Amino acid sequence: MSVITIQCRLFSEEESLLYLWELMTQKNTPLINELLELIGKHPELEEWIQKGKLPTGLVKTLCNSLKTDLRFSGQPGRFYSSAITLVDYIYKSWIALQQRRERQISRKERWLSMLKSDAELEKDCNCSLDVIRAKATEVLTQIATPSDLHYNQPTENKKGKKSKKGKADKAHGKLFSLLFDAYENTTDPLERCSLAYLLKNGCQISELEEDPEKFATRRRAKEIEIERLKEQLNSRLPKGRNLTGEKSIEALETATHNVPKNEDEAKAGQATLLRKSTSVPFPVGYETNEDLTWFKNDQGRICVRFNGLSEHTFEIWCDQRQLHLFQRFLEDQQTKRDSKNQHSSSLFTLRAARICWLKRQGKGLMWNKYRLILYCSLDTRLLTEQGTQQVISEKAAKIAKILTLTKDKEELDDKQQAFVKRQQSTLDRINTPFLRPSKPLYQGQSSILIGVSLGLKKAATVAVVDAKQDRVLTYRSVKQLLGENYKLLNRQRQVSARHSHERHKAQKQKKPNQFKESELGQYLDRLLALEIIAIAKTYQAGSIVLPKLGDMREIITSEVQARAEQKIPGYKEGQKKYAKQYRVSVHRWSYGRLIECIQSLAAKTGIAIEVGQQPIRGSPQEKARDLALSAYSSRITSMN
């Protein structure tokens, strides 16, 4: 993606700020709350969850029915559109999470149904363990290929470290899938038990006697995972923002006068009381770039007016580094006006915008305690002449395809004819490009990838991989990436540890425990991102591969557990204590913020971003390498 987001403060007269504050807090946010509640109470919600989406036009229909309600009437049209888009997005995300949890539960329950002790396997097939092992050896020879068997036995290099770990993990995963499919498809008791024996022992024949306590702990751990997922599956529906605090008061009255019927109801009531309500209204989004009108006032300041709020003018207060971008927004719109609409707004640098309130330190009225912020999304390719030509080519090809498909239809209704006319007009006008400065586009080699692995001890580790040659060009640790600034990382760890200790003491004394973090972590993220982009330019990398954030909890948990088992083998309580101390000693990193910094700088440079699943096992260097190779392999597979 080549889209980045910038922000600025909007300054205006107090009357304008008051009007916008009341409109967003008393009209728009209550409307969004009502829409969320209506969908949550709909009798067909479970059916929509199974389908994976809400019916097309449902949110819009509900919103239209509420427009006549005095509580929500009198808003600009764009405010209603923003509410519809936001509610649809919230439920789309929530339904996706619910479906993911259901899939996880299904997979774990399948595994749990197969996971049996050696004694249970002997009883199911009425055979001894030696017979099961012999059958397992036979099945393994039939199903596994020679390469699978080879990689199933880890080899060691001269230094005693396991080699070809990435290939071994891949081969092991393939063999595991084959064995599990065979288990699902066979009905022979002995064969099923032998397959179950192989699967629970990591696709190998174990010569050791099974420890009943360890097996019981392993099975119970999986049961707990399923129970936790089911609790999350039954979690509360999406709720709005409680700006007035009325719901908190209602929950307090309920808890005062009613005794909980069971433990679950008590937990739910406690969670409601402890939940910190926000006093910030929902943002308002402007999805089209012509909803904003740019101009300069008498003092020469750049100002903006919004569609539906044309009587109110807002000055742009921004950083000097971003001023030229807002100047570009103004120039684009001025160019189109001067040319009498011979230019197309589809080539405006600005793509979309959003206004919201941001809390700040201050006293007085609510609209003075909060700053009005404007977020603008822009396409970095439209900042240069070469990038604009690239966008024109893409849009022209897309419109030509649409027109070809539409013209193949024999009869078109009035809406379709108007749509064809608009597309043809856009196609004619995009050939009149805006004046842009010339700057060569970044040209990287598609076979060279930058893999970035994230971890608890090592925040970021980089591997530059030539996937076509299947070799690593270089590695970079977090210490090498930061260079002389590595000492700042130690300072960040000390600050984080101190805040953690102070927060723990405040919680025990039931005092406020929200300690404001410094911007040192954000500064370190920017330094890491800058160095990663510099490495990509040096090696002419075609893309940067980042791990999925959804996998970070499992990755970090696995990393801590592996370290604990290595330090204190065979002692569970000691491992738990060590893991807790280890988490305190290392930093708590904002991986999402780091990824955003890398994505933003990559978009400005023109380097593609790919997302993959980071391996759980291996060193940080091996994880970064395997992440890049996996992304390249997936890319080749999708192309074929």
Regions found by a protein language model. Give the residues of each.
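Nucleic-acid substrate recognition interfaces
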Residues: 1-450, 454-640
